[in-house]
Amino acid sequence: MEAIRQLEKEHMRLDLPDFSSGDSVKVHVKIKEGEKERIQVFEGVVLKRHNGSKSTAATFTVRKTSFGIGVERIFPLHSPSIDRIEVVKRGLVRQSRIYYFRKLTGKAAKIREKRDR
């Protein structure tokens, strides 16, 4: 069991910013097309984080609206395919899983910004 924890600790990424559900983020993902590798940016609102950040199995779900259609993508937090994560805006939400955000459209889909004091 200790060997597994040691192996997980080696694969953990320490360069990731602290973010939570409701935050607007830009996820820079490495995509391999043939022999070329490029970076694609997926920008949206974090709906949930799964398994926190202590485990290599930690994931987070990001939702964006593209041409009027909602697109959700689940990213492994410690994946080597993620180049970097930028927090664009901190959101003020009361729940840790904001699934109700899927049903909202227009101005109702706005999330208030968390102010730093």
UniProtKB/Swiss-Prot annotation:
<dbReference type="GO" id="GO:0022625">
    <property type="term" value="C:cytosolic large ribosomal subunit"/>
</dbReference>
<comment type="function">
    <text>This protein is located at the 30S-50S ribosomal subunit interface and may play a role in the structure and function of the aminoacyl-tRNA binding site.</text>
</comment>
<comment type="similarity">
    <text>Belongs to the bacterial ribosomal protein bL19 family.</text>
</comment>
<dbReference type="InterPro" id="IPR008991">
    <property type="entry name" value="Translation_prot_SH3-like_sf"/>
</dbReference>
<keyword id="KW-0689">Ribosomal protein</keyword>
<dbReference type="InterPro" id="IPR001857">
    <property type="entry name" value="Ribosomal_bL19"/>
</dbReference>
<dbReference type="GO" id="GO:0006412">
    <property type="term" value="P:translation"/>
</dbReference>
<protein>
    <recommendedName>
        <fullName>Large ribosomal subunit protein bL19</fullName>
    </recommendedName>
</protein>
<dbReference type="Pfam" id="PF01245">
    <property type="entry name" value="Ribosomal_L19"/>
</dbReference>
<keyword id="KW-0687">Ribonucleoprotein</keyword>
<dbReference type="InterPro" id="IPR038657">
    <property type="entry name" value="Ribosomal_bL19_sf"/>
</dbReference>
<dbReference type="GO" id="GO:0003735">
    <property type="term" value="F:structural constituent of ribosome"/>
</dbReference>
